[in-house]
Amino acid sequence: MSEVTTAEFNEEGKYLRKIRSFVLREGRLTKGQAQAIESQWPTMGLDYSPTPLVLSDVFGREADTVLEIGFGMGASLVQMAKDAPEQNFIGIEVHKPGVGSCLSDAAIAGVTNLRVYHHDAMEVLEHAIADGSLARVQLFFPDPWHKKRHHKRRIVQAEFAELIRRKLKIGGVFHMATDWEEYSEHMLEVMQAAPGYQNQSSDGTVVPRPDHRPLTKFEARGHRLGHGVWDLMFERIA
């Protein structure tokens, strides 16, 4: 297991170490995952380029676009794409087995409204997604980095909230979910302080799981054991 970093330099040429919110755990691809990448990447894969996508060209139509950061094995993302054929979906995942699994499931489901990146989400968001182009950004069950000394690695920080705000349309929604209560409190604190957002919760805290987010097997098992999951939804208003 190795931490993923990118070499960056400031204007004076000083090396800057960029902290990542993930660690790369590259398992072996199964035969099915490898075959799915080979067969489906030409139609569903997006090769990273530091120029903004023209979404109407990518999908061949004008439609609301939902982007998910870190889709894991992709089962819930494929289900969402299948359930909402009128919307476009983009998933970003750094772990190759997850990409292969997602593409395999998407092919079996017959979805045509899903595209996938195998790349660092921050670089994709910063360079490949146009400002004001997304209807929803999803961040489900990110690494909580529960040790206090690792809190700086949490992806939900003030700068990240501003980056997401820029990428959303006015009226677009940033939807987060976590099964770590303390992280939900951190998310809420960051987002309440972030300019240009309005909490969609009626009481200013969390929201019930919306219908568009499928209940995962892991989550269903957690419910049976009395474990909580916290959803937060913030709308871009400025």
From Swiss-Prot:
Its EC number is 2.1.1.33. Keywords: Methyltransferase, S-adenosyl-L-methionine, Transferase, tRNA processing. Substrate binds at residues 147, 179, 216-219. S-adenosyl-L-methionine binds at residues 68, 93, 120, 143. The keyword Ion transport does not apply. SUPFAM superfamilies: S-adenosyl-L-methionine-dependent methyltransferases. It catalyses: guanosine(46) in tRNA + S-adenosyl-L-methionine = N(7)-methylguanosine(46) in tRNA + S-adenosyl-L-homocysteine. One of its GO terms (molecular function) is tRNA (guanine(46)-N7)-methyltransferase activity. It comes from the Bacteria. GO terms for cellular component: tRNA methyltransferase complex. CDD domains: AdoMet_MTases. Pathway: tRNA modification; N(7)-methylguanine-tRNA biosynthesis. Belongs to the class I-like SAM-binding methyltransferase superfamily. TrmB family. Catalyzes the formation of N(7)-methylguanine at position 46 (m7G46) in tRNA. NCBIfam families: tRNA (guanosine(46)-N7)-methyltransferase TrmB. This is tRNA (guanine-N(7)-)-methyltransferase. It comes from Shewanella baltica (strain OS155 / ATCC BAA-1091).
